[in-house]
Design a protein with these regions (language model features):
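Short glycine-/small-residue motifs
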Residues: 124-127
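A conserved hydrophobic helix/loop-capping motif in glycosyltransferases and polysaccharide synthases
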Residues: 10-12
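Vicinal oxygen chelate
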Residues: 1-8, 29-80, 88-118, 129-132
Length: 132
């Protein structure tokens, strides 16, 4: 029986290099493949594809203006991290944000603490640490 490919999600972005760095550093992901149009990042059992938008307008992202956070997106990527607090710092350094500690929530039955945030282009992302 053939092995199934790893589950993955694709995030469409304006700046592939910047967004690859953001996700790579936020969730300690390894770069599996990278070219001018896309990058494939991997963390245990999951791949995230950072793919260039084609023909879409650039969102306001890091040029000093506000980032439009797409809260009602059809997809939210949830990534495992060692520490939500550390992820919050990394996200801020790279132009994104993770909400403050009072917005974190615990899922005892699923074994994690989570907090939402956004990447530098406004895509919603959630970080999850093991519940201790």
């Amino acid at each position: 029986m053939a092995r199934l490919p790893k589950p993955s999600a694709v995030v469409f972005v304006s700046n592939v290099a910047r967004m690859t760095r953001f996700y790579r550093e936020l969730a300690s992901m390894a770069v599996v493949h990278e070219d001018g149009d896309h990058a494939v990042l991997e963390v245990e059992g999951f791949q995230l594809v950072i793919h260039a938008l084609r023909g879409a307008p650039d969102p306001v992202s890091g040029g000093g203006g506000p980032v439009h956070v797409r809260r009602d997106s059809y997809l939210k990527v949830c990534l495992p991290v060692a520490s939500i607090a550390a992820a919050r710092t990394v996200a801020a350094q790279l132009g994104g944000a993770i909400q403050p500690p009072d917005k974190e929530w615990l899922s005892r039955e699923r074994g994690f603490r989570a907090c939402d945030g956004h990447d530098p282009e406004g895509n919603v992302v959630q970080v999850r640490e093991a519940a201790g």
